[in-house]
Amino acid sequence: MADTKVDTSKEVSAKDLKEKKQVEEAENGKDAPANGNAENEENGDQENEVDEEDDDVAEEDEEDDGEGDDDDEDEEAEGGTGKRAAEDDDDDEDDVDPKKQKTDV
């Protein structure tokens, strides 16, 4: 396999593709689409951005859950009551629900 040549002349970098897209948009008049398809593509891009934001929020929630668990263990080690630890768990759940509601709106 070491003797096999790879033709890299056909490979296009992401930067080149982005520049090509910008040139095409300038030539075609991105702001004034001839048909509704161009507008739908723009909306599709916006939906993808929202999806990426939702993924980020989910990752943050996972990190927060890990930190909250450590706090509960510290209280138990200090001699805190089981009732207090249960109240803390309820607080963590309350913190998560508003975040989910914000992303749904």
UniProtKB/Swiss-Prot annotation:
GO cellular component: nucleus
This protein's record includes keyword tRNA-binding: no
Family statement drawn from the similarity comment of this UniProt entry: Belongs to the pro/parathymosin family.
Gene this protein is translated from: ptmaa
Tissue: At the 20-somite stage (18 hpf), expressed on the dorsal side of the embryo in the developing central and peripheral nervous system (CNS and PNS), in the tail bud and the pronephric ducts. In the PNS, expressed in the otic vesicle, trigeminal ganglion and the anterior lateral line placode. Localized throughout the hindbrain, with highest expression in rhombomeres 3 and 4. In the head, expressed in the olfactory placode and in the diencephalic region.
BP-aspect Gene Ontology terms: negative regulation of apoptotic process; positive regulation of transcription by RNA polymerase II
Pfam families: Prothymosin (PF03247)
Biased composition (Basic and acidic residues): 1-30
Subcellular location: Nucleus
Gene Ontology MF terms: histone binding
Protein's name in the database: Prothymosin alpha-A
Sequence intervals crossing the membrane: none
Start and end residues of each stretch annotated as Disordered: 1-105
Domain of life from the UniProt record: Eukaryota
Organism: Danio rerio (Zebrafish)
Keywords for this protein: Nucleus
PANTHER family: PROTHYMOSIN ALPHA
Biased composition (Acidic residues): 39-78, 87-96
